[in-house]
């Protein structure tokens, strides 16, 4: 309940009469905690970190870069998470954006530019290290999805969360099946369960509609799978040329 007081002048008595009016504001429903936790843990800014970490631990990278996991992951964490988060925080601090949800599309240009620049620097770092082309395709996937997200969002809202987790799953599936010939059913089952939990969480928080959730996951997974798949055959072509 909120009380507002207003004052009016009564001419015949030449005094101020105070009138009080009561305005009822219904209490706002609190958002459920568990969906908020899931949305935070599976935030798009963490997906590149999860993707690279899973690929590192599930492939021969563990042997090729033995005892270098922290060193390998440090630039990934720095460029894909710390720089974008710091940039968004600075934009919020300077009131360039009103909130972190970025509901206003007119505020998207600078935040998306921050993410694009960060992912581009990450790609350049590993490109300079001359790693496998298929791995560079994995690193380049967030840039591709970011461009697709920006284009689609001009006409229709799509779930960035589901695009991100779909991109992670697509990359890991493509690496395991097309490059390393690995069959990891337990890992894949866990990833799809997490994607389902994230989709339900976004619906419970009223952040997305079912169509936005489904399309976001489909676009992210298909594009990332095919992109890494193309990177695999491109690396094979380059290898054959050098024979």
Describe these PLM feature segments:
Residues 1-35:
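Short, Lys/Arg-rich, polar N-terminal cytosolic tail immediately upstream
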Residues 32, 98-114:
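Juxtamembrane helix-capping/reentrant segments at transmembrane boundaries
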Residues 38-59:
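The first (N-terminal) embedded transmembrane alpha-helix
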Residues 59-68, 96-100, 128-130, 232-243:
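Membrane-interface helix termini and inter-helical loops of multi-pass transporters
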Residues 65-81, 102-106:
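Loop-to-helix transition at the N-terminal end of transmembrane alpha-helices
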Residues 88-96, 122-135:
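Transmembrane alpha-helix boundary signature
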Residues 113-123, 164-169:
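Core segments of transmembrane alpha-helices
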Residues 129-243:
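Membrane-embedded catalytic cores of phosphoryl/pyrophosphoryl-handling enzymes
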